[in-house]
Amino acid sequence: MSSQPLTLQDMMAAILRFWSEQGCIIHQGYDLEVGAGTFNPATFLQALGPEPFKTAYIEPSRRPQDGRYGQHPNRLQKYHQLQVILKPVPENFLSLYLESLKVIGLNLVDHDIRFVHDDWENPTIGAWGLGWEVWLNGMEITQLTYFQAVGSKPLEAISGEITYGVERIAMYLQKKNSVYDVMWNDSLTYGDITQHAEQAWSQYNFETANTSMWLKHFEDFAAEALATLDKGLPLPAYDFVIKASHAFNMLDSRGVISVTERTRYITKIRQLARAVADKYVIWRESLGFPLLKTIPSTPTVTAKQIPHICQDEDFLLEIGSEELPAAFVPTGIQQLESLAKKLLADHNISYNNLEVLGTPRRLALRIQGLSHLTIRPEAEKKGPPLSLLFEEDGSVSSQGEQFFASHGLSISHRSALDQSSTICRVRSIKGTDYLFLVIPEERIETAAILVNELPLLIRSMRFPKKMTWDNGGVEYARPIRWLVALYGDQVLPISLGFVSSGNISWGHRQLDNRQLTIPSSKEYIDILRDACVIVSQKERRSIIEQGLQNLTGDQTVAIAPEHLIEETVFLTEHPFVICAQFNPDFCSLPKELLIAEMINHQRYFPTQNLQGEITNRFLIVCDNSPTDTIIEGNEKALAPRLTDGNFLFKQDLLTSLDSFVEKLKSVTYFDALGSLADKTARLKLHLEETYPLLPLCPKEDIDTAVHYCKADLVSAVVNEFPELQGIMGRYYLQNAALSKAAAIAVGEHLQHITLGSSVSTTGALLSILDRVDNLLSCFILGLLPTSSHDPYALRRQSLELLTLLYTTQSSVDIEDLFSRLVRHFPTTIPNTVWSPEDVLNKLCSFVWGRLKTILSSLGFAKEVIAAVLTENCPKNPLTIINSARSIQELQNTQTLETIASTHNRLKKILASLSFSVTEQIFSLITSEDMLFKQALERFKEATTSLPISSREYLLQLEDLSQSTALFLDSVRIADDDENIRNQRIALLVATQKCFGFYAWDAL
């Protein structure tokens, strides 16, 4: 970095000058309030259609919700994005970006630069793409994106977008802790020019903006966009889409749109953007796509001869790409391994060992001792019946001529088959003669198979999202830039789109960014290591785990969730673990808030002491040799995040909980079901109905918890960190000196519940009430999940409801529970037709279907689950689980064998008889009848207080089964005497009921 850092305006000018030299048009920012540079027509509209375009411009961007009254070091409601669009994307896209950093004084060797997975999406305008956040020593400074769709339209030509966060970059270059201290030019700071405006606009955005006016603006702008489109004017129409989007952002900042209502607004804007995109492409096509005259030519790929491999050798395939998302690398490793093994097995190719290695820039398949030949054994292919191939006189039929010609055979008569036994054979199948073609044994070179199959294998790999980057027709997780395919020391010529294989790989992007010649597969790992790439993921994990352990000592431990360790393994090619610190004053913030900032946002490992208290030391896994610059940069990256968290938390503590509750009235839950205040009122009704059934905790505690459980939804912290909903509510209740049990319950009621979760009784009851209300709400509104889509997590919530009822040992029939609580919903709902009966039937079936998952998780055998989950079983989760436990305890014992065999015998006998169901038993005539009746009465008396789910009930049922079997052996049920017959049938009907709802024939 130069000794004299650039001012903000000089820095922006340098970047624009760099891109101008690359052929970009220098545009100006748009003259409307846009939330990001992507909204500028130079991006949104120019990305559509096939026309090439290269531009760079500085976009003033408005995000009302990000305002911090001019007090935050880098959060602004109005800031600048320097946007670059390259269409089509050049192959050296990432390299060009890194070169642009050099022109503003960044020496890349001194910094830890990461390309961190970013599936960028702007749902408001139906735009999405795949790429990265670029982190400079832990601070996000740029977004790089390969656009895949704009205006909900897949793109004909891919655009590459670079979005520089110019304020953040300037802060780093000038070593400023606050954006307001950044020198705009040699005499004025950023604060001199913008800070007062930030204060004024924050006050307007959050406090005084007229929500009625903005609601009307939104509707008016949306209507005008449609009207303008109808007149065939997509450009003016798009301006009104931008205006509608800004109106939505204003309403969002005022907190009058709930999480659920946001979807409706966003959907409306997205539909408008799609309509504009459609009309724009049609309009440009009518003009003949005038910019197509400048489209560049595409590269060509030349086929090469397959080398002859004469002995078994090691094989290497390296798929070199731009940085893969960390979560995609293990997926790629698993797939490449399984697909390669299947390929070799399908072709009967032997080998000694196979492994797949992966880093952000490469997936490498290494096969040791790969056989150079495979033998395809002789095989037969069934053909048509001879009667279709030959006429009666033996001559070849017209169909036969076509068949033989298609297989390159010269057969003129039926008799010729006898001289062609090595090619054709006749076999009789069920009296009909068929022709079989003989495919002789063949020795095939493995190299030829690999050349043909490997491109198909790579194309077949699946990732959560795949992308295109040119018109080569290839989709992959990120652009493929090189292929290494070595069989021994010979290059196998494979091609994928415009990329052809060779023996050239690449070293570490920062530590040793040079081409590497790989002489053979055996030398691959060592050559990569010499170029600072540790290609083995196991070795990188070991380095990270050891580094975390070495830097924590005896009195502290790293908070190191498995997902973060794995992510850092696949974010690095040569990991180093370093320690940094933050201001210890921040340790007074809620632990969960600190962890969310460090782990979720920064991929840092927090540390805590042996008492579980957060310390001010944190650990960083970087991908460059540690320097003071890297440590200082990461500390500076974290400080604004903690400052923001502290600002929001302190702001919330100054607001009373009752003020939060009052504000819930203005936040929509579901448009058709009113506000969050309406939901809270409904939860109170649910509680009054449910508490007699589930008196799990003191009433005053659950009353308090229900009243305040949604209060933190309108807090500043939860608005910024939605994942902390409920957790922050706990802190706010504690701050208000309310019931400790209620505070804990609020903190627990939104956490994911599993069989191993520890939840307080008050928290469990609150969680039950909330989940039942959510389920009923969605089913009433028809928001049912599909096989692939469950946006409201109804499956998970159903599982959690059943789990809570079981873990609290609450004996509740869910049909009864739902039928009681559905009465608390309005019978008439706008734009919704519903009936309680229909909702209850669908909801009970849906929730009950999840119980099988819980039974499986508890380890019950399939036959046990089938025995208890029957059509007529009670809809009581606790009863069913206890029943399964009792059955499983007695499985493979004489008890169950006796019960099952007797029940099945009884069921078969009753099915064979014709009778009217009755339990009335009159005077019994025979001693056998009397004895059996007495056994039945003893059973009923013994089980009066026993639940049918208990082991003791089943043991009593065993005794009754033995008495039943003895009775059936001793008498003839279908006695000639009608009275005796009816009495015995009545006895059996009464006995059958004692076997309960169980499916005994499943055992």
UniProtKB/Swiss-Prot annotation:
List the InterPro entries hit by this protein, alphabetically. Answer: aa-tRNA-synth_II/BPL/LPL (IPR045864), DALR_anticod-bd (IPR008909), Gly-tRNA-synth_bsu (IPR015944), Gly-tRNA-synth_heterodimer (IPR006194), Gly-tRNA_ligase_asu (IPR002310)
Q: Which CDD domains match?
A: GlyRS_alpha_core (cd00733)
UniProt cross-references to SUPFAM superfamilies, sorted A to Z? Class II aaRS and biotin synthetases
Q: Any idea where this protein resides?
A: Cytoplasm
UniProt keyword Aminoacyl-tRNA synthetase, yes or no: yes
Q: Where is this region: Glycine--tRNA ligase alpha subunit?
A: 1-310
User: Which molecular function GO terms apply here?
Assistant: arginine-tRNA ligase activity; ATP binding; glycine-tRNA ligase activity; protein dimerization activity
- E.C. code: 6.1.1.14
Superkingdom of the source species: Bacteria
Positions of the region Glycine--tRNA ligase beta subunit?
311-1003
Biological process according to GO: arginyl-tRNA aminoacylation; glycyl-tRNA aminoacylation
Q: Name one GO cellular component term.
A: cytosol
- The reaction(s) this protein catalyses: tRNA(Gly) + glycine + ATP = glycyl-tRNA(Gly) + AMP + diphosphate
Keywords linked to the UniProt accession:
Aminoacyl-tRNA synthetase, ATP-binding, Cytoplasm, Ligase, Nucleotide-binding, Protein biosynthesis
Task: Report any Pfam family annotated for this entry.
Answer: tRNA_synt_2f
Membership in a protein family = Belongs to the class-II aminoacyl-tRNA synthetase family.
Q: What is this protein called?
A: Glycine--tRNA ligase
- The protein's gene is named glyQS
